[in-house]
Amino acid sequence: MQYEDENGVNEPSRRRLLKGIGALALAGSCPVAHAQKTQSAPGTLSPDARNEKQPFYGEHQAGILTPQQAAMMLVAFDVLASDKADLERLFRLLTQRFAFLTQGGAAPETPNPRLPPLDSGILGGYIAPDNLTITLSVGHSLFDERFGLAPQMPKKLQKMTRFPNDSLDAALCHGDVLLQICANTQDTVIHALRDIIKHTPDLLSVRWKREGFISDHAARSKGKETPINLLGFKDGTANPDSQNDKLMQKVVWVTADQQEPAWTIGGSYQAVRLIQFRVEFWDRTPLKEQQTIFGRDKQTGAPLGMLHEHDVPDYASDPEGKVIALDSHIRLANPRTAESESSLMLRRGYSYSLGVTNSGQLDMGLLFVCYQHDLEKGFLTVQKRLNGEALEEYVKPIGGGYFFALSGVKDANDYLGSALLRV
């Protein structure tokens, strides 16, 4: 693996090479391919779930407050567009594809069998919506000199740098744009990705990809049941209520009073971390120690010393950490103080399983994704509190990046990123 230096890596030569490959692919001379390990598949939901549909048009993009679907994919791309007009063409094209794929319809028929088929065919003759959401975010690198967008960069957007416990692989970090693709079933997610790549060979090149899942019963609960991660603990118990609009305005969405560029209003900062678990080591760790590390009962999810998952721990009555250790994950992540209220964020994580590492260990972990109105007050502040926690012995962040999720598409005459590109 190629590892990141502390401040990340710059790859202009790679982008130029990929642009040339993309042009060949558009001409039908060279397919764009990126080798990846075989991904794990979540189970299937009921047939009725295929007809579930999320609205595409609105103030915010779907896939952020949407209750988690069972299947998910993160795909980062390098943008091959040559200028701002080309970038607008890309965003308009993505908007068109997202609108069709998320709402469903008949698969296009290929008029000439001597030409490549217009659709991959993996969903059959009808493309069901299947609760599909595709969320577009932009990375720090999109605001370099290529498109003249530097003055419009979100104020808190930055390149992800290494924390003390990180072991970042450069091939799994950053990206000009990121797609978070979620649906009830994995074949719908894969179909969406292939459709997008087919329509953008001269504009996008895959940088890295990871697929994730949560259990079907957690997905069917529509946010009422907390998913369990591959360490066996509930993941996201302390999430703020995504159905509380007033709270989401405070926690997730960029608002006019933040002195951000005007185009960012209605969008959200997105932090992505690919975290590898040392599951064999974890499975040989005593239950009591596991629970002490997290600060929760493994079966119920309740804070130690309490009965129910959503009971609020009373740290003031446990100042020495005799019940919930001072360095436990939940106590460090959210100390429940007046100051920590400003670091709330909405988590939307998924498990992943990739096979085995080069050393023969199971390659499993967490695709950590969170949204917040301020990256520094949210994820970065929380992660700094977590530096040195006991859990670090069992987890290793290996990739990801920081992005900005664009605001929504108003109507059929609008397109993703229009407010940014019209400045």
UniProtKB/Swiss-Prot annotation:
Belongs to the DyP-type peroxidase family. EfeB subfamily. It comes from Escherichia coli O1:K1 / APEC. It catalyses: heme b + 2 H(+) = protoporphyrin IX + Fe(2+). Its EC number is 4.98.1.1, 1.11.1.-. This is Deferrochelatase. Predicted to be exported by the Tat system. The position of the signal peptide cleavage has not been experimentally proven. One of its GO terms (cellular component) is periplasmic space. Heme b binds at residues 236-238, 329, 334-336, 347. Binds 1 heme b (iron(II)-protoporphyrin IX) group non-covalently per subunit. Its main location: periplasm. Homodimer. Part of a ferrous iron transporter composed of EfeU, EfeO and EfeB. It is found in: Periplasm. One of its GO terms (biological process) is iron import into cell. Involved in the recovery of exogenous heme iron. Extracts iron from heme while preserving the protoporphyrin ring intact. Residues 1-35 form the signal peptide. Pfam families: Dyp_perox_C (PF20628), Dyp_perox_N (PF04261). Keywords: Heme, Iron, Lyase, Metal-binding, Oxidoreductase, Periplasm, Peroxidase, Signal. One of its GO terms (molecular function) is ferrochelatase activity. Its cofactor is heme b.
